[in-house]
Every structure is written in structure tokens, then in C-alpha cells.
Amino acid sequence: MFTGLITGLGTVREVSSVGGGKDARFVIAVPTGNAEWSNIAGAKLGASIACSGCCLTVIERGDDAFTVEVSAETLAFTTLGTWQPGSLINLEASLRLGDEMGGHLVSGHVDGLATVAGATPENGSTRWRFIAPPGLARFIAPKGSIAINGVSLTVNEVQDRNDGSNATEFGVNIIPHTAAHTNFSALQPGDKVNIEIDMLARYVARLQSFPHG
């Protein structure tokens, strides 16, 4: 379990194929000079780390990097399939008992991919707009929580596009600190991002799908 508060910006160092070429192994370098990640060599094998919102298992670790393996399904349904050496990765270690709950509960199970529609300056911050993936728009509500590339954010508005596409667009505000310490700084219109909808919205929708009585 995670909170959506990114504690470091990692970099993909190596990418290799495993499992007959369908799965992938990534070596991710942790940020230097960051106390949160200075002891990655001491991380337990099997530990969970959220990498741009996707919960991954540490299978190897060294002085300044850790290694994860990713299945073909995860590669196909998340941004991980586009990772290459140099890609910037939002990092968060799993929540521990007693840690501050500063964001919202994030499982690290990506629900789908949203598309960057654009970004505009707004009163010192930046309003980012995304096109929601089909089937997930109904879970996204104004003032609700959403994780984008693992970052806990509040939805500002949700609106249907009037361009005949039947797509739904939603917006969030990113302050300069968040932009500087996450991979939002590298996003461009048309890019895909991992999103995880709020757990409460997911369970409410599931309950409503059953007959009342």
C-alpha cells in the first residue's frame, strides 16, 4: 500500500527481455543525494516499490539501483511497455505502520492509461488536462482523489468533450514543487500516463451493480 507522495525520481538504467522475450527486467537507478533512497542496498528482497504508480517487487538491489521484473500483461496495459534507458520514474516505498498518511490510499494496481490533453499555466501552478480511458470516466469525480503516474492528486473538474469523440476529460493542478520532483516535468500532449482510481469509488460502483433488496 502507498500514499501517492513521491519521495524520489529514479531513472531507468537498463532494460532486458526475460521469459522468452515477452516479460522485461528493469534496473532502476535511485536519485543521488536523496536520504529516502540512500540505503537501497539494504532493501529487502521482495519489497514493494511503486514505480510511476505500478507496484513492483525488488528482485535485486545494489548501492544505487534496484531491479524488478515485469510481466507481458503489465507491459501491455501500463506505461512500462514504453520505458527505455533514461526514462524518469516516480518512486515511492511501501507504506509502513506509523508513516504519515499525507496523500490517499494507493494500491499500486494501475487501472488504465489516460492521455495528456494539454497543460496551461494557472496562478503559479499548471492545470493539466487528461482524457480518461473508456470505462473509467464514471469513477472520476470533481474533488475526488486520483493517482497519476503514482502521484496523489485532486480532480478539479470533469467534462465530456464536445468533439464527437464521446471522450471524457478531467483536470488537475500541479504546483511547481510537484512538477520539479516528479516526471510531470517530462510529459507532453499525447503522452500516456498510468492512472489508479480512488478505491472508494471502485467499491461503491461494485456495490451498486448488485440488486437492492
Map each language-model feature to its residues:
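Conserved loop->alpha-helix
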Residues: 1-213
